[in-house]
Amino acid sequence: ASFDEAPPGNSKSGEKIFKTKCAQCHTVDKGAGHKQGPNLNGLFGRQSGTTAGYSYSTANKNMAVIWEEKTLYDYLLNPKKYIPGTKMVFPGLKKPQDRADLIAYLKESTA
């Protein structure tokens, strides 16, 4: 199912998902450094593999996907299938509601 068919996202639930599943490797804080994964501030509208100062896999650079709701929704289902060769070890979020909630949170927190 695509993002067009996704349930409405709840950013408060998304924040909990981010803290438990993403914050170990990512931050959303403007000006903060990279962790294991790149800083996600300014994520929407950015091309994969282009954040300054982060060492991306060739796969992420070559994919050249523009991050927006639709691409994140598909990516977060199964990152390794969406970008074969990505360094991200996260297995993905299988529930459509979890993906919608996380995207709602990221949209607010990374702007």
Swiss-Prot record:
Q: Which residues bind heme c?
A: C22, C25, H26, M88
Task: Consult the record and explain the modifications the protein receives after translation.
Answer: Binds 1 heme c group covalently per subunit.
Q: List, alphabetically, the SUPFAM superfamilies matched.
A: Cytochrome c
* Top-level taxon: Eukaryota
According to the UniProt entry, which residues carry N6,N6,N6-trimethyllysine?
K80, K94
Q: Which UniProt keyword terms apply here?
A: Acetylation, Electron transport, Heme, Iron, Metal-binding, Methylation, Mitochondrion, Respiratory chain, Transport
A Pfam match is: Cytochrom_C
Q: Which residues carry this modification: N-acetylalanine?
A: A1
Give the location in the cell.
Mitochondrion intermembrane space
In its UniProt record, a GO molecular function of this protein is: metal ion binding
Which GO cellular component terms, listed alphabetically, does the Swiss-Prot or TrEMBL entry include?
Answer: mitochondrial intermembrane space
User: So what does this one do?
Assistant: Electron carrier protein. The oxidized form of the cytochrome c heme group can accept an electron from the heme group of the cytochrome c1 subunit of cytochrome reductase. Cytochrome c then transfers this electron to the cytochrome oxidase complex, the final protein carrier in the mitochondrial electron-transport chain.
**Family classification:** Belongs to the cytochrome c family.
- Return the protein name: Cytochrome c
